[in-house]
Amino acid sequence: KKSKIEKLYYFTVEDWKINRGKHLNNIRNTFSSNIIVRSSSFGEDSVDKSEAGKFLSVLNVNPKSNTELSRAIQRVINSYNSHSVLDSKNQVLIQNQTKNVILSGVLFTKTLESDSPYYVINFETSGSTDSVTKGKVSNTIKIFNNTKQNQIPSKWKKLISAVKEIERLTGNDSLDIEFAITPIDVIIFQIRPLTTVRKNLSKDVIKFVGNKIKKNE
């Protein structure tokens, strides 16, 4: 396998209102260390625009504290409401918080302006994923999709290899991928198809890729 997907748990806003206790118990039993509570909304990235950072993500949440966890989840849900994105099918994602991050960012498998075959990598080297979740990455590099592996800068070889695997597994070469790089792994946070029709498939795609990667282990 070329990348790692952090353990993932998710639910809709509607289901949270109905089954809050069940989800708190499931999260407490699923995660042993600090987590990040993330948004996954119909209002997030598409081929026409990026909404990265529009909705809240909460870092350093203790999964064993019902009070802290409930507050973090509600803050994410409130961020939907504050932007008038009130669809009850909006989701909340719970993931392990990645440690020892060297750099993190967002990669587009095509240029948004002209659909050109370049990997566009927007990244930060602060050592935190906070810039990604807030949509504040400030460095950009473009790498031609068909660049030979030995010609790719060493800093990006593992990431590009992981992205090519994801493209192959999904059968989709128009993707928006949130990632982090640690000394050991390429971590994939979210995968969104770059299409105006399929805006909210991030958790479905990421589960599909995760299952495929596990089968190849």
Where do the model's predicted regions map?
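Catalytic core of tubulin tyrosine ligase-like
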Residues: I77
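Glycine-/small-residue-rich beta-strand-loop submotif within the FAD-binding core of flavoenzymes
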Residues: L56-L59, S65, R71
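ATP-grasp fold ATP-binding core
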Residues: K1, I5-T12, R28-N60, H83-K99, ...
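Conserved divalent-metal-coordinating catalytic cores
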Residues: K1-K2, F11-R20, V47-S50, T67-I73, ...
